[in-house]
Amino acid sequence: MSRPVALVTGGGQGIGAATCKRLAQDGYDVLLTYNTSSQPAEMLVDEIRESGYDALAVKVDCANDGEVGLLGIHPWMARKIDVLILNHGAYRRVAADQMTIETLRNTMAINFEGAVGVYKAVQPHMTDNARMVVVGSQLGIRGSPHGADYSASKAALAVWARSLAQQ
């Protein structure tokens, strides 16, 4: 019998890496994405494999529809996804009154639209009992004077996730 599969976006470092390690400890094979740095992601893959589970890191810019689309046809999708963790994100500290529309659009493209895109690409390959976790932030509730764009993107994610849960 094959092991369950977890997909973690932004899994190469930080909260994502810790989540990948925990999922492997809980018996999952892990497909993780990274965007900017392959080395930490590959080191994590090696660590998970050494513990007896399978893991693979793939480069995906979640703001790039083409790369997200390729994730949706990745060979691991044939194994079916049991857990989807939408963890990727970008946070650039910019004072709220200095934020440009371009900055806002870029952050929303990565953090919000990217998460929706990954979900749409992967959803046909999720098991009937699959679970999804959307990693949020308290800044999505209370805002931030140095990250209004990030706060808005996390608020959008929270509302979107609640909307999906109501279906």
Region spans (language model):
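Conserved glycine-rich cofactor-binding loop
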Residues: 12-13
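Conserved glycine-rich Rossmann-like NAD(P)H-binding loop of the short-chain dehydrogenase/reductase
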Residues: 28-42
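Substrate-binding pocket helix/loop in short-chain dehydrogenase/reductase
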Residues: 95-96, 100-105
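Active-site loop immediately N-terminal to the catalytic Tyr-X3-Lys motif
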Residues: 97, 142-148
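Active-site helix of classical SDR
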Residues: 119, 153
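Alpha-helical segment proximal to the catalytic Tyr-Lys
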Residues: 124, 166-167
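Residue(s) in the substrate-gating loop at a strand-loop-helix junction
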Residues: 137
